[in-house]
Amino acid sequence: METLFVKANDRENSVTGLLYEAFISTYKALNPNDSIVELDLFQEHMPYLNALMIEVNYKAAQGIPLPTSEEEVDHIVKRHLNQFLAADKIVFAFPLWNLTVPAVLHTYLDYLHHPRKTFTYTEEGLVGLLPNKKVALLNARGGVYAEDDRSEMAVSFVKNHLNVFGITDITTVIIEGHNQFPDRSETIIQKGLQKAKQVAKTF
């Protein structure tokens, strides 16, 4: 079993980091035989999606040979795509920054949109090709958001991308309100960390 852990927060002592450590330490202890890969997106060279990358992605999908100048771009995207495809389970840890995800996570998700690899086109529309993958989303946000709050574009954003790939087995662990309610901050955080550990036990 291969499990990929994707972290998208470079702030020291962040609540996202605490969530990540609570989950992965519990998971590792209970799954010693798993192949575990940790990917810290802020430590990666990940150019934003642009016209060149879109063109290279199209050529690669069509099997068109790439010139040397485009091979490096293709390598960056394919390395992350193939790593994602190889994983049976994926854990994402990310904060809500300014109503959405960190730009580096947005870029990572852009890399995963690959026709014939993660989705395909049909007369009825897009069909995801990865229905058997299992995902956990670990999210920290200082305020409190209703489940259908349109201003929350972090967890919902990631879920929408995963749904395009056919992934629906998604578990979420959210710590929220620790900035909005500073008098209860520690209690809120500890409760969320305990939930992360419980989810990790059965993930």
From Swiss-Prot:
GO MF: electron transfer activity; FMN binding; oxidoreductase activity, acting on NAD(P)H as acceptor; oxidoreductase activity, acting on NAD(P)H, quinone or similar compound as acceptor
Matching Gene3D superfamilies: 3.40.50.360
Substrates-to-products reaction catalysed: 2 a quinone + NADH + H(+) = 2 a 1,4-benzosemiquinone + NAD(+); N,N-dimethyl-1,4-phenylenediamine + anthranilate + 2 NAD(+) = 2-(4-dimethylaminophenyl)diazenylbenzoate + 2 NADH + 2 H(+)
Its EC number(s): 1.6.5.-, 1.7.1.17
Obligatory cofactor(s): FMN
UniProt keyword Oxidoreductase present: yes
Keywords on record: Flavoprotein, FMN, NAD, Oxidoreductase
Cofactor binding summary note: Binds 1 FMN per subunit.
Enzyme class (EC, first level): oxidoreductase
Assembly information from the UniProt record: Homodimer.
Function: Quinone reductase that provides resistance to thiol-specific stress caused by electrophilic quinones. Also exhibits azoreductase activity. Catalyzes the reductive cleavage of the azo bond in aromatic azo compounds to the corresponding amines.
NCBIfam families: PRK13556.1
Family note: Belongs to the azoreductase type 1 family.
Name of this protein: FMN-dependent NADH:quinone oxidoreductase 1
Organism of derivation: Halalkalibacterium halodurans (strain ATCC BAA-125 / DSM 18197 / FERM 7344 / JCM 9153 / C-125)
Organismal lineage: Bacteria, Bacillati, Bacillota, Bacilli, Bacillales
